[in-house]
Each structure stands twice: as structure tokens, then as C-alpha cells.
């Protein structure tokens, strides 16, 4: 998580498509490292302090930026703010375990917790009370691509897609969408969109109160597209109120993301999902039992084994459908099988694939 290791804490299952990571590398003079001021390929850096939301579907240990999008952020303020440079917060009280991550946003007094299934994320926010907001930012991310689409399908739900790709800046045509369904598990929500309005000149700039600013859409609820857009949900929270956010993804379709959400999260609480994720990690990490050595040496070993099992990732939805490479086709894996992606051959050919074949065939 530091010294350019590009590893991250966060919530993920072994080989999971979904990986929820705290984001603290976006444009703040409070941070030591900034993703837009240097070569940077990870959503998190241990020494940084300015948190701007949780990103979904992330890479680990890579040398080029991609993915790291769909940023979700809780805030508390009388006036809604959707500019990440202004709504970000310092954070403290980090906790990280396999399948779970938590921190406390010091600016807002909000405790944030995240856990994951193979294809979905569950957030749990504990609010101090007062006017509270949950933001979905589609304009920011580690990807080198821009462009996203949103549509509100229920008072507490938005669906859409975001373009990803152009890994390492040179694979210019290697782009693809990620689809999502996000629900805020609370009634009595005000909701809307935002979009950054490009600057105008002359009288147009004088007449437009949203010129070169984020425009809030409080009544429009149809489809919205753009490079720097997002969705907001606002409500009056009671002191200590907990609100869950559930987000499912798919590389096939919005319908696939919805099926994943229903199949993996229906009827389950945050704590149940967390326990299942921890159980998956215990099962896979226990494939190798270490005898002897110090506790520190065991910690180093199992941390390395944990990192081994982050990639490759499953690519197919719960119905077996997945996108074919270098085309628009959709494939289907046989029942009981997985389709994997993020196979790296850069140095991993030395020992990673042999170990996976022997211990996790």
C-alpha cells in the first residue's frame, strides 16, 4: 500500500470481479501522491489522507492505471456539494480484514464499512445525524477513458455504465463498458443528477449561472450522459442511523448487473455478506497450513497468499455470460465452470501459475 507497491486494502472475495477500495489519490494538497500529477496506478496510498469515495472493480499490483471507477461517497452538510475537490474528507480508524474494510471520515463523523460478494458490494454508513448525502461519481476514476450514462429507475436506484480501458495509454482501442445497478436501502430520499458544464465565452458565460460549474438536476430523472456526471441521494438522518448501499456490476449488461445483485445479495444483511466473504478467504487461505516459524513470518506468508488470490478474476455473470475479447460477442461458460480475466504474464510465469495449478486447480 506504499512505496509504489500499488496494493490496496478493501473488500474482495478470492478471484472476485468486485473489489471495493478506499480512494485517496485525487487532487488535494493534503496528499503526498496525486493520480493526475504523476504516473500513478492505484486508488489508495497509505500516506495520503484525503478520501473521496470507494471505487469499485480494481486492479492490484499493476504498473498502469485502469478501472478504479464508480466512486461512492457519504457526506453530511446542509448544502449539497458534488465537487470531489470540496466534498473529500480526512479519515482515521482504518480497519482491514479479508473481505472487509472500514474507516471514519473525520470531517463528517461518518463511519464507513464495505464488504463484497464475488460480483457485488455492500456499503454500511453510520451517520451522526443531520442532512446527509450519498454520492455516485462517474466522472473520476483511474481509467484513461471518459464517458458514462445514468438512469434513475426507482426513488432509491440508479443504473448505468461507464467506459473503461486504454490500459498503459497505448492500447487505444481496447475499451469496454462496465454496467452497474446501485440501490440506497432507505425510504424518503431526495435524488437527482449532476453534470459539469463546459466553460462558455462572452454573453453565454454571463447568462448561464452553471457555466464552468457542476449543474444539479433536481427534477430531471430520465437518462443522463456525459464525461463528468454523477447521481446524488439526500435525506435527514437520525443520530446513529445506518444506511446500506448495494452495488452490482457486470461486463455484459445492466440486466446482468441486476441479476448478479439479486442472486448474491437478496435477503442478506451486511454482516451476513461479510461473514460469507471471510469464510471464502478462510477456506482458500487454509489450503496451505504453515507449521513453525514466528507469527510475523506467518503474517508475511499469508499476506502474500492473499495477494496471490486477488487475480485472476472471474469475468462471467451469475448466468454464465461474459464478453468475448476484441469484439462485441457474448460467450457463456458451462455450468460449474468459471471464465477468468486479468492473467498477467509479466514475471508471474516464474511461480504464480505453477502455484495456482498445484493448490487451486
Please provide the spans of the model-predicted regions.
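Accessory carbohydrate-recognition regions in carbohydrate-active enzymes
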Residues: 1-361
